Design a protein with these regions (language model features):
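Thiamine diphosphate
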Residues: 1-35, 203-432, 443, 492, ...
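Conserved catalytic-core segments centered on acid/base and nucleophilic motifs
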Residues: 34-37, 41-44, 314, 318-320, ...
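Active-site metal-binding loops of divalent metal-dependent hydrolases
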Residues: 36-42, 73, 160, 272, ...
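Active-site glycine- and acidic-residue-rich loops that bind
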Residues: 42-48, 133-141, 244-248, 401-408, ...
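Acidic/histidine-rich catalytic neighborhood of metal-dependent amide-processing enzymes
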Residues: 44-55, 342-345, 408
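Loop/helix-junction capping segments adjacent to catalytic residues or to phosphate/diphosphate-binding pockets
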Residues: 45-46, 275, 336-337, 471-472
């Protein structure tokens, strides 16, 4: 085959991630097959097939991904939960999730050694039966592939005992432990039992060499940069300072513009854009659903993909970005933790990728401070500490825009980057605009920007603040401190990754490396003072670079503690001691 016409094989296993990449690849590359191997360890759970069911419903014409279920009766350390299923049950399970063409090859049907149990070891068959079983697998694979590439959704299921041909059988075959060395009898016996002649090994090598038409680096479409639709100048709208605007809505307008310019662009969200003040996205790009309904902005050709499973939302968006497409995942912060591991998988892969690919972008709204209800389910800003820890990876950037202007600057900046993971955290409530567009862009590019500084005063109190809503009590505290004769500087920490020292971050180890860090002179101009107080509506992790570098002799942090059911943002801030009075008192004590 010609170069760049093959898909890439991916693995789902119990981790339940591989299917997202297969679906993303199939969506970006019609006519190219994307197989994905899946172990049966998770098949008794809804994890893997749940996401595929939603995809099959949303994209009924995209069939060019092929799940390959390795049904061997065991998980990692126990029997698989579907170990007792019959072949008919397993076939029905897949058909119930939209896979009408089930190709199931059961090794037991070829067994001539009278093995016990539903799962048998094909490597102990006679040579003729081994060839027959192998031939059946190859024939089923070819048929399944042809179906998948011709618009008929298919799955290939290979059923045989786990550990066939290796050192142990069942779940015990899953891992190699310290005792499993070449000196161990069970290892050496296994190698002798399955030894091949030199000619047979050469045949294996030849098959691998020729598979797919050549080396994957030359033939796999995912090894090449995907040509993207050009984007026009974004319709950035500069709001006047002190004007009250909704950051999420301002962001949504830019997302809508990107989708209108790029037909392959996909927005993923767990059915909550409108509740997050981003109805403008649904209105412009439409929710993808087989039922046309203008009341809900839904159409079969929509660009807004809305499974309720956050893992499926993040999975498709991350897979599209990794494979070269544009996407954005929009989430309630409260349930995002269910999906973040696949984002970490993708950002790690992007760090090692041999080509450029658009950065993975996500935005979290309905944050803890404004989601007062159900404190035990809807207030989980602790995930921001996860983002903060990943800043040291070298290619992960949590962004904390301070207003509706800066969130536009944040997305504008993100769209111009490659091989990075970018999480934007913002509010869905009307909040004061505190930056010009020039200041907003400066804060994102350099890492921080001054929002306010007293014209006069005695000792200086610096507030280093992440986010937008947390600024409300900070500006109130400023009035109290100025009345007491102090000078106050309020700094928006918008892109804390840029505030680290170069040696703090593994930036030089990643693809598309970024060594832009704020120098000491600019940092000190922002954060020097008699007292520095870090303030955040979330956890304290994102403020680490400021606390590491500040020369202020007295410093403190006022951050999120825990959620509680309240009626207003002010009440939840008071519950967490994030009030103007508390901030002014803390500063006064530090000054004393």
């Amino acid at each position: 085959p010609d170069a760049a016409d093959e898909g890439i094989g991916v693995i789902a296993r119990q981790a339940g991630q591989g299917q997202h990449f297969a679906m993303a690849g199939a969506l970006l590359h019609p006519g190219v097959l994307f197989p994905v191997t899946i172990g049966d360890g998770g098949m008794g759970e809804p994890y893997v097939l749940n996401s595929m069911m939603h995809f099959n419903t949303a994209y009924p014409g995209v069939t060019n991904y092929l799940p390959v279920l390795i049904w061997n009766g065991y998980s990692q350390e126990h029997h698989a939960m579907c170990a007792t299923w019959s072949n008919d049950q397993m076939s029905a399970y897949w058909k119930g999730h939209g896979f009408d063409n089930v190709f199931l090859v059961d090794a037991r049907q070829f067994d001539d050694k009278d093995q016990e149990g539903a799962y048998v070891d094909s490597t102990v068959f006679s040579f003729d039966r081994r060839l027959a079983f192998t031939g059946a697998v190859l024939q089923a694979a070819e048929s399944a592939a042809r179906h998948a590439l011709s618009g008929r959704r298919a799955v290939l299921i290979v059923k045989q005992l786990k550990g066939a041909g290796v050192h142990k059988l069942g779940a015990k075959a899953h891992n190699l432990y310290p005792a499993d060395t070449l000196d161990a009898e069970h290892i050496s016996d296994g190698l002798k039992r399955r030894a091949l002649s030199p000619d047979a090994w050469q045949l294996v090598r030849d098959n691998f060499f020729r598979a797919g038409g050549g080396p994957a680096a030359k033939t796999a479409v995912t090894e090449h940069v995907l040509e993207l639709a050009p984007l026009p100048k974004l319709p950035v709208r500069e709001f006047a300072k002190a004007e009250s605007q909704v950051p999420a809505t301002a962001f949504g307008a830019l997302v809508a513009a990107v989708g209108q310019a790029d037909p392959r662009f996909v927005v993923t969200n767990a059915d909550g854009n409108e509740a997050s003040a981003m109805a403008n996205i649904n209105q412009a790009l439409k929710i993808r659903h087989p039922v046309e309904d203008p009341l809900y902005n839904q159409t079969p050709a929509g660009q807004v993909y809305e499974p309720l499973n956050e893992d499926a939302c993040a999975g498709l968006a991350a897979g599209l970005a990794l494979f070269g497409g544009r996407s954005v995942w929009l989430s309630y912060e409260s349930f995002a933790i269910n999906a973040w591991p696949i984002v970490q998988t993708v950002t790690q892969a992007m760090a090692e990728l041999r080509r450029k690919t658009p950065s993975f972008v996500c935005m979290f709204t309905a944050g803890a401070l404004e989601q007062g209800r159900n404190g035990w389910t809807h207030q989980r800003p602790e995930i921001e500490n996860y983002f903060a820890a990943q800043m040291r990876n070298g290619n992960v950037y949590p962004l904390f825009p301070c207003d509706a202007n800066q969130i536009q600057a944040a997305y504008e900046w993100a769209l111009g980057t490659y091989n990075k993971g970018i999480a934007i955290i913002a509010s869905k409530s009307p909040l004061p605009v505190r930056t010009s567009m020039e200041e907003a862009r400066t804060g994102i590019e350099r890492g921080a920007v001054t929002l306010y500084e007293s014209p006069a005063g005695g000792k200086t109190v610096v507030f280093a603040v992440t986010g937008d809503m947390a600024l409300l009590p900070v500006f109130e505290a400023k009035d109290k401190l100025e009345a007491a004769g102090h000078r106050v500087r309020i700094v928006s920490v918008a892109n804390p990754r840029r505030l680290y020292r170069p040696g703090d971050v593994a930036w030089e180890t990643v693809s598309e490396p970024d060594n832009a860090f704020m120098d000491d002179d600019h940092f000190n101009a922002l954060f020097d003072g008699d007292v520095l107080i870090g303030v955040t509506g979330g956890p304290s992790g994102p403020l680490e670079p400021v606390l590491l570098r500040t020369r202020a002799l007295r410093r403190d942090v006022m951050a999120w503690k825990r959620g509680e059911t309240t009626a207003t943002p002010g009440e939840i801030m008071a519950f967490n001691d994030l009030t103007a009075e508390a901030m002014a008192n803390r500063a006064s004590k530090l000054l004393a």
